[in-house]
């Protein structure tokens, strides 16, 4: 089901992953002038957000998932445990939704360092707040706890953009209204 480092085994992931079409549309519009930039989705699950980007003519897309799903997408989903250090061949924009809270606290720094070391532009992320609950939430943190952790890794928080994306969230994934955050790499 859920690995000790927080990733979901693929058979467990399929029925439990939630995709927000409104958030995905917002991401496509927000990044509309970055269609030829490298974009990664860390902990991409089934690859739904990347698939929406691909449908909107984004060209350089790679998903990272510890146990990649079998798909017929025209982009790659590579096997990568986010709790272990890694450097990708090219830095890029990073999307990382509903991932950090699934890693036990002991892997938090490596996970955040992986994001920082592989991001060259925007980071669009979320982190479940304390008390939110959810399958395999080992490390829920309030915004005022996780934002400084990301800032100290060379990012600037973009509160206006964060609030903008939170406003489009559908009711079935209302937790995103408290957890979505947008950053820019310094």
Question: What are the roles of these predicted feature ranges?
Answer:
Residues 97-102:
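Short catalytic micro-motifs in class I SAM-dependent methyltransferases
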Residues 121-124:
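Short glycine-centered segments of the SAM/dcSAM-binding site in methyltransferase folds
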């Amino acid at each position: 089901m859920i690995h000790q480092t927080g990733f979901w085994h693929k058979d467990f992931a399929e029925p439990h992953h939630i995709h927000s079409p409104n958030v995905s549309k917002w991401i496509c519009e927000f990044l509309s002038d970055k269609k030829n930039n490298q974009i990664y989705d860390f902990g991409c699950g089934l690859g739904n957000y990347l698939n929406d980007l691909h449908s909107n003519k984004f060209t350089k897309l790679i998903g990272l998932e510890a146990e990649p799903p079998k798909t017929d997408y025209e982009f790659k989903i590579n096997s990568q445990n986010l709790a272990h250090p890694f450097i990708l061949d090219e830095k890029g924009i990073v999307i990382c939704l509903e991932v950090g809270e699934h890693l036990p606290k002991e892997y938090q720094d490596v996970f955040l360092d992986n994001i920082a070391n592989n991001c060259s532009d925007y980071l669009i992320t979320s982190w479940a707040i304390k008390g939110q609950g959810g399958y395999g939430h080992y490390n829920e943190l309030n915004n005022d706890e996780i934002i400084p952790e990301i800032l100290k890794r060379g990012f600037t928080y973009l509160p206006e953009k964060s609030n903008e994306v939170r406003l489009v969230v559908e009711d079935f994934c209302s937790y995103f209204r408290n957890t979505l955050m947008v950053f820019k790499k310094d």
